[in-house]
């Protein structure tokens, strides 16, 4: 893998070797509950966030002392557990997913570690219908792991939902190496590229792209 610097030159010499990347990805041990949730995801056809991404989500939630978090794409609860691990003890997670079976798995994962039901709202439905009903500037962190075709719309809604100083994080930001490949021009890839550019070029956001998991784009709202 090579990286493009501000000067337009690539910095391939700084790219980690596969063994180094794997070491970093697994550096933080995964809790048993998260490992169990990850295992339950496979039969449901869910691709959960990587270990490195999960550890980063915990770090981000702790860094902003998150009390109110929105998650787009519940999955089997792996990312939700990671967010809870960093949130304040009174924090509430609002998680949206189109698949009730996914949310049932996530609910089981949350309850398995003693998270009370009043700390999570699992909303079954289309995120583009749910998000507009949530309050402006009321959330500390928005995590996007939904349909890549809707990433630009998620970003627009996420920015609206964030308080000043809040964070938005987009998983699958490298999309299996497709984003960096100029030969990949399918609709899904172009949609994610558009979302990345929207975040990068937004005047109200400070942005970084982290090479953890399948890529995690993180931005703070000024």
Region spans (language model):
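A short alpha-helical cap/connector motif
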Residues: 1-141, 148-169, 173-222
């Amino acid at each position: 893998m090579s990286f493009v610097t501000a000067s337009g030159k690539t910095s391939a010499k700084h790219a980690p070797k596969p063994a180094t990347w794997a070491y970093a990805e697994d550096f933080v041990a995964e809790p048993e509950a998260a490992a169990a949730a990850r295992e339950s995801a496979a039969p449901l056809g869910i691709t959960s966030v990587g270990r490195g991404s999960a550890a980063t989500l915990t770090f981000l939630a702790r860094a902003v002392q998150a009390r109110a978090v929105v998650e787009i794409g519940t999955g089997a609860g792996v990312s939700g557990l990671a967010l809870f691990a960093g949130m304040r003890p009174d924090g509430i997670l609002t998680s949206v997913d189109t698949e009730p079976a996914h949310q049932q798995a996530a609910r089981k994962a949350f309850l398995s570690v003693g998270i009370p039901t009043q700390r999570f709202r699992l909303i079954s439905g289309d995120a583009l219908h749910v998000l507009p009903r949530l309050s402006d500037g009321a959330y500390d962190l928005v995590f996007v792991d939904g349909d890549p075709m809707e990433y630009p719309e998620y970003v627009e809604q996420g920015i609206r939902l964030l308080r000043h100083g809040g964070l938005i994080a987009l998983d699958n930001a490298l999309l299996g190496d497709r984003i960096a490949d100029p030969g990949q021009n399918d609709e899904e890839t172009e949609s994610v590229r558009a979302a990345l550019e929207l975040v990068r070029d937004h005047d109200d956001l400070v942005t970084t792209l982290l090479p953890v998991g399948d890529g995690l784009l993180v931005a703070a709202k000024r």
